[in-house]
């Protein structure tokens, strides 16, 4: 009898179901919930998140240095960077406008009885927002945050933008050395990169356990009762995310001769993992690895993916625009066209460059709502369902960043079509065989 092997996607799905069942039980049995959550489930979930954070920085640095040293052309790198930022700005602006449009059409906040809504303490987000605003966050603030004063400190804090900036400079400096001096160090960084990808595969074996624990904690703490009063908001956010992924990104992919549906099938493991953990970082190493295998050069993949985690959060910006209009409708505030334009422009700035901030979507909303006169207290009403919405928007962030790599590779005429087709046959062939079993 053959040994039955389940793919990572099936293992994570099974872990999600078990986590939901256990969390549902614990939600109504508070006597056993507190001890299990504090002593077993939360630590088990935190271990997985810590493992992911442990491998992200070495992978980003090593792949960027290898990729940039391989390019060795500052002008070419500047061109890639400019195209990447332009693409990110256009796509996230489309996400903001789509979110505001859908919220105005479907009116998720209209007719909601505020007395039936539970509130959650958001003081921790308010203090974070004050810290971000006091640091002059904006275009110049973001530019200033690119340059690290201490790269070791930035690595310890996981600050992605300074790490990218340093790695690019280091790669350019390395590429200018004579080959006899350059190649040994490039070989070292290439070995580090390959080793860290092996470590990633080891960490992924623990993913089902981490997912089980994280889902169980979420359901145990919030249950499902908090969803019903906000069902229109939850459904609209999920519809908007599906629409953006399949239609908006689908059109972008088609214009580039790609298929977003094939991309989603290739990323099925990563999407399930990102959705269940609500963490984009959990799949960053595998996105870099898969997009390289799918035909994008390492010089583009290693730059676009980590940069996208700060500038191309499609799911987050889509959610933020819907949430802003929802809160306005909740309070009966009818925003004018001019106020909505201000909202779009404000979100275009505030949603960039603070990906490392805890509760980033809430921080962005707190920094944005006041600009159009929307009460900040309204965020307390949606904080209880934020985890559920965070799972969906994280999955869209993953698809958006993966597609961005392929778009920039196509734009630079560096996309390897033969390699991509071979990878499609390999991955989708395995997918079809698994489905038949």
From Swiss-Prot:
Residue ranges that the UniProt entry lists as topological domain Cytoplasmic: 1-5, 72-84, 181-210, 254-292, 346-361, 409-437
Membrane-spanning residues: 6-26, 51-71, 85-105, 160-180, 211-231, 233-253, 293-313, 325-345, 362-382, 388-408
- GO molecular function, a single term: amino acid:proton symporter activity
User: One GO CC term of this entry?
Assistant: plasma membrane
Topology in membrane: Multi-pass membrane protein
Q: Which SUPFAM superfamilies match?
A: Proton glutamate symport protein (SSF118215)
**What is the annotated localization of this protein?**
Cell inner membrane
Biological process, per Gene Ontology: dicarboxylic acid transport
| Regulation of activity | Glutamate uptake is inhibited by L-cysteate and beta-hydroxyaspartate. Inhibited by the uncoupler carbonylcyanide m-chlorophenylhydrazone (CCCP).
User: What is the first-listed, main subcellular location in coarse terms?
Assistant: membrane
Role summary: Catalyzes the proton-dependent, binding-protein-independent transport of glutamate and aspartate.
Q: What is this protein called?
A: Proton/glutamate-aspartate symporter
Identify the taxonomic lineage of the organism of origin: Bacteria, Pseudomonadati, Pseudomonadota, Gammaproteobacteria, Enterobacterales
């Amino acid at each position: 009898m053959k040994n039955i092997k389940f793919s990572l996607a099936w293992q994570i799905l099974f872990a999600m179901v078990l986590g939901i069942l256990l969390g549902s039980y614990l939600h109504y049995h508070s006597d056993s919930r507190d001890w299990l959550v504090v002593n077993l489930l939360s630590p088990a979930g935190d271990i997985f998140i810590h493992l992911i954070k442990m491998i992200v920085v070495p992978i980003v640095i090593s792949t960027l240095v290898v990729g940039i040293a391989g390019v060795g052309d500052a002008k070419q790198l500047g061109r890639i960077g400019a195209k990447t930022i332009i693409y990110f700005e256009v796509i996230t602006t489309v996400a903001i406008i789509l979110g505001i449009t859908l919220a105005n059409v479907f009116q998720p906040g209209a007719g909601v009885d505020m007395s039936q809504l539970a509130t959650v303490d958001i003081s921790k987000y308010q203090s974070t927002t004050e810290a971000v605003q006091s640091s002059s966050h904006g275009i110049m603030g973001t530019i200033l945050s690119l340059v690290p004063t201490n790269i070791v400190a930035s690595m310890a804090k996981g600050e992605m933008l300074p790490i990218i900036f340093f790695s690019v400079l280091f790669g350019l400096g390395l590429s200018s050395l004579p080959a006899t001096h350059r190649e040994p160090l490039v070989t070292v960084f290439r070995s580090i990169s390959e080793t860290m990808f092996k470590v990633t595969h080891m960490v992924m074996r623990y993913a089902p356990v981490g997912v089980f624990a994280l889902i169980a904690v979420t359901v145990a703490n919030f249950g499902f009762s908090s969803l019903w009063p906000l069902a229109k908001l939850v459904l609209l956010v999920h519809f908007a995310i599906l629409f953006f992924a399949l239609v908006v990104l689908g059109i972008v992919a088609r214009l580039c001769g790609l298929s977003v549906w094939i991309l989603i099938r290739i990323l099925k493991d990563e999407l399930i993992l990102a959705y269940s953990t609500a963490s984009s970082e959990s799949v960053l190493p595998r996105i870099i690895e898969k997009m390289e295998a799918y035909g994008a050069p390492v010089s583009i993949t290693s730059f676009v993916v980590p940069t996208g985690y700060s500038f191309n959060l499609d799911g987050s910006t889509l959610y933020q625009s819907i949430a802003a209009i929802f809160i306005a409708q909740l309070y009966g505030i009818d925003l004018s066209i001019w106020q909505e334009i201000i909202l779009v422009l404000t979100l275009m700035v505030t949603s960039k460059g603070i990906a490392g901030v805890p509760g980033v979507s809430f921080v962005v909303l707190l920094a944005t709502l006041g600009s159009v006169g929307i009460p900040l207290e309204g965020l307390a009403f949606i904080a209880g369902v934020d985890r559920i919405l965070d799972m969906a928007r994280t999955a869209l962030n993953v698809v958006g960043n993966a597609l961005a790599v392929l778009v920039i590779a196509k734009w630079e005429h560096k996309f390897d079509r033969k390699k991509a087709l071979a990878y499609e046959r390999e991955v989708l062939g395995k997918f079809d065989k698994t489905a038949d079993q």
